[in-house]
UniProtKB/Swiss-Prot annotation:
Range of residues in the leader sequence: 1-20
Family: Belongs to the FAM174 family.
UniProt organism field: Mus musculus
The protein, known as: Protein FAM174C
Glycosylation sites: N22
Chain ranges passing through the membrane: 47-69
The UniProt record lists the keyword Nucleotide-binding: no
Modified residue annotations for Phosphoserine: S93, S96
Lipid bilayer topology: Single-pass type I membrane protein
Gene Ontology cellular-component annotations: cytoplasm; extracellular region; membrane
Amino acid sequence: MALRMLLLLLLLWCSNPGSAENSSLPGPPYNHTNGRLPDRDTGSAVLRLFYVITGLCGLISLYFLIRAFRLKKSQRRRYGLLTNTEEHEEMASQDSEEETVFETRNLR
């Protein structure tokens, strides 16, 4: 019995006084508001924002690089006058049955 009493007194002596919200003992006044944000949270948010922006810029540049190399346009064939006078093309007229021969030697 004395051992139980000693243990009970030891526990009461080591216990913390109750908080102001849940105790019959008055505690010191406590201010729940804090005027500034903790530095650790602000720094990690800025660092996370930096990583997100860097990742987005990397993805956008990768998209444009892939688009530039995959959709490389082949050289367009330029149509103009024939340089060789031996090459003649005959085209049939749809309106009449006459044949028209196009020559390039006098067109320059």
